[in-house]
UniProtKB/Swiss-Prot annotation:
Main location: membrane
Any one GO molecular function term: undecaprenyl-diphosphatase activity
Membrane spanning stretches: 1-21, 42-62, 74-94, 95-115, 172-192, 206-226, 232-252
Top-rank taxon: Bacteria
EC number: 3.6.1.27
Keyword Cell wall biogenesis/degradation attached: yes
Function: Catalyzes the dephosphorylation of undecaprenyl diphosphate (UPP). Confers resistance to bacitracin.
Subcellular location, record wording: Cell inner membrane
Name this protein carries in UniProt: Undecaprenyl-diphosphatase
Miscellaneous remark of the record: Bacitracin is thought to be involved in the inhibition of peptidoglycan synthesis by sequestering undecaprenyl diphosphate, thereby reducing the pool of lipid carrier available.
Gene Ontology annotations for the cellular component aspect, listed alphabetically: plasma membrane
Name of the gene: uppP
Pfam family, any one: BacA
Length: 252
C-alpha cells in the first residue's frame, strides 16, 4: 500500500464511520477500486485506522465521557456486541467481500427509508442521551451487534435502533457516536494485537497516516451530520446506500 492510498482510505474511514452508510463497506469497495487485495493484513489496517475516528468522538465529547450515569448506559449497550464480537470473530472476518457489502448496502438503505417514513408524523419520547433507559441502551447494543456483517453500518444499525426505541435523531446519533468508542477500540486493539507480527515499518507508517487523516475527517463528518439532521431526515442516506450498492453491483 502506498502513502497516497493510506490517505484516501483514511479520508473514506473518517467521513463514513459515523454516517449511516457503512464505513467498512466503503473501505472494502474503495480498496477494490484501488486494486488492493483484501488480505488479513489489509483488513487489519482498515480496522486499525478506525482508532482515528474513535479519538475524534473522544475529543468532541470528552466532558460527556466523564458522566458516570451516561457511561453506565454506554457500557450496557456495549455488552451484546462485546460478547458476540469475541465469539464470532473468525466468522465475521470471512464475510469481508464486495457481494455481501452490496447486498447489505441496499437492504440497509431500504430499512432506513422505511423507518423514517414510519416515524414521519410521530413524536419522540427521548430527547437527550442522559434520558436513555438502561433497557433501551441494551437493545441499541443488540442492534449494533447486527452490524458486524460488512456493509450493514454500525452507526446505521444503532441509529435505526434508537429511532425505533423512541430516541430523536440527534439523541440517536450522539448515543451512536459514544457507543462507537468502546466498540471500535476493542475491535481495533484485538486486530492490531493479532496481526502485530504481520506489520513492517512501512505498514506502521501507513497506519499512522491513515489514523491522522481519519481523525481529521471524522471531526468534520460528526459536526456536519449533527447540523444536517437538525433539519433533515436520514432518508437521503438510505437513497445513497441503494444507489451506491446498485452501481457497484453493475460495475463489479
Amino acid at each position: 500500500m502506498t502513502t497516497l492510498e493510506a490517505v484516501i482510505l483514511g479520508i473514506v474511514e473518517g467521513l463514513t464511520e459515523f454516517l449511516p452508510i457503512s464505513s467498512t463497506g466503503h473501505l472494502i469497495l474503495v480498496s477494490n477500486l484501488l486494486g488492493i487485495q483484501q488480505t488479513e493484513q489489509h483488513k487489519a489496517f482498515e480496522v486499525s485506522i478506525q482508532l482515528g475516528s474513535i479519538l475524534a468522538v473522544v475529543f468532541l465529547y470528552f466532558k460527556k465521557f466523564l458522566d458516570t450515569n451516561l457511561m453506565k448506559r454506554i457500557l450496557i449497550a456495549f455488552i451484546p456486541t462485546g460478547i458476540l464480537g469475541f465469539v464470532l470473530y473468525k466468522i465475521i472476518k470471512s464475510l469481508f467481500n464486495p457481494y455481501i457489502v452490496v447486498f447489505m448496502l441496499v437492504f440497509g438503505g431500504l430499512l432506513l427509508i422505511l423507518i423514517e417514513l414510519y416515524h414521519k408524523n410521530k413524536s419522540y419520547d427521548i430527547n437527550s442521551i442522559y434520558e436513555v433507559p438502561y433497557q433501551k441502551a441494551f437493545l441499541i447494543g443488540v442492534f449494533q451487534s447486527l452490524a458486524m456483517v460488512p456493509g450493514t453500518s454500525r452507526s446505521g444499525a444503532t441509529i435505526v435502533g434508537g429511532l425505533l426505541l423512541g430516541l430523536d435523531r440527534k439523541t440517536a446519533a450522539e448515543f451512536s457516536f459514544m457507543l462507537a468508542v468502546p466498540t471500535m477500540f476493542m475491535a481495533t486493539f484485538y486486530d492490531v494485537y493479532k496481526n502485530r507480527s504481520n506489520f513492517n515499518l512501512s505498514d506502521w507508517e501507513n497506519l499512522i497516516v491513515g489514523f491522522v487523516v481519519a481523525f481529521i475527517s471524522a471531526l468534520f463528518a460528526i459536526k456536519w451530520l449533527l447540523k444536517f439532521i437538525s433539519n433533515h431526515s436520514f432518508i437521503p442516506f438510505g437513497i445513497y446506500r441503494i444507489i451506491l450498492g446498485i452501481l457497484y453491483y453493475l460495475w463489479y
